[in-house]
């Protein structure tokens, strides 16, 4: 059974409302073998800075009685790497970035 799940969020039309959480999905490369990225309405990529950023010093994660505290600090390879490597990878899928 096919259902029309198309929706608009902030003026952007998505084929469905299923998107990834910012930061936890990176650029999706690590998940391409696990799920069909074409089924997602959008991929919300990890934050990208102009220059490569190492993030915060360790320890970055602390366990609490109710879960984890995360302070990775937006570690990323920078905008040039994102444009040259991640965007071409993501464009092969029929989903919004």
What do these predicted regions represent?
Residues 1-96:
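N-terminal capping/small domains of soluble enzymes
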């Amino acid at each position: 059974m096919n259902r029309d799940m198309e929706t608009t969020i902030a003026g952007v039309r998505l084929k469905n409302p299923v998107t990834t959480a910012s930061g936890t999905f990176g650029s999706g490369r690590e998940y391409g073998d696990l799920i069909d990225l074409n089924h997602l309405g959008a991929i919300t990529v990890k934050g990208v800075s102009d220059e490569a950023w190492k993030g915060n010093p360790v320890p970055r994660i602390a366990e609490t009685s109710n879960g984890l505290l995360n302070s990775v600090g937006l570690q990323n390879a920078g905008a040039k790497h994102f444009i040259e490597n991640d965007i071409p990878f993501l464009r092969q899928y029929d989903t919004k970035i």
